[in-house]
């Protein structure tokens, strides 16, 4: 579609596609634009058909699988030589995990026995798939700086969390202490 305002980054939709991980389990979700909602609310339905703005379904990775993959990714990258720089590149994972843990299905999943079993399966899958960082495959998760020294690590990461996430968010981001506490609680479930 032609944009009225050129160079406005807010006029773009970013779709992330990951080809590294196993895309299962997935679930179909309906994508419905705010423009569609606005046109319905203002009784301008004729534009929906005219501009092909109808909702559509897309297969997306389940929330539970997303949560597990983000946790495993953080563990893996924590074994880089420069942990702070490496984890800084994944800072959005902390934000995502925080919001996933606001979802009732994710809360119940994390409390279940299946959580640790599936975490271990994804961890093993990543050990087989990814050689970087060097030597990480033979290390126990209990050796991860995210477990051994998270408070110190988070002190070095929280500024990146505040600045980077605030730049992308349309509303205030969650308090970094709440995000850290959420992550620590998740780590307790995999130790």
Model-derived features: where do they sit?
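Structured mid-to-C-terminal alpha-helical surface segments
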Residues: 1-191
């Amino acid at each position: 579609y032609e944009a009225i305002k050129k160079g406005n980054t807010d006029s773009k939709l970013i779709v992330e596609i990951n080809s590294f991980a196993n895309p299962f389990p997935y679930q179909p979700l309906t994508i419905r634009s705010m423009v569609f909602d606005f046109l319905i609310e203002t009784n301008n339905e004729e534009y929906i058909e005219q501009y092909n703005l109808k909702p559509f379904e897309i297969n997306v990775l389940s929330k539970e699988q997303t949560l597990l993959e983000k946790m495993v990714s953080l563990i893996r990258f924590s074994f880089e030589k420069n942990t702070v720089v490496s984890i800084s590149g994944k800072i959005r994972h902390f934000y995502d995990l925080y919001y996933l843990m606001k979802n009732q299905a994710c809360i119940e999943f994390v409390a279940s026995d299946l959580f640790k079993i599936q975490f271990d399966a994804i961890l093993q899958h990543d050990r087989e798939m990814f050689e970087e960082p060097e030597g990480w495959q033979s290390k126990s998760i209990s050796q991860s700086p995210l477990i051994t020294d998270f408070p110190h690590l988070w002190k070095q990461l929280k500024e990146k969390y505040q600045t980077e996430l605030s730049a992308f968010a349309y509303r205030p981001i969650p308090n970094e202490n709440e995000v850290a506490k959420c992550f620590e609680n998740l780590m307790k479930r995999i130790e």
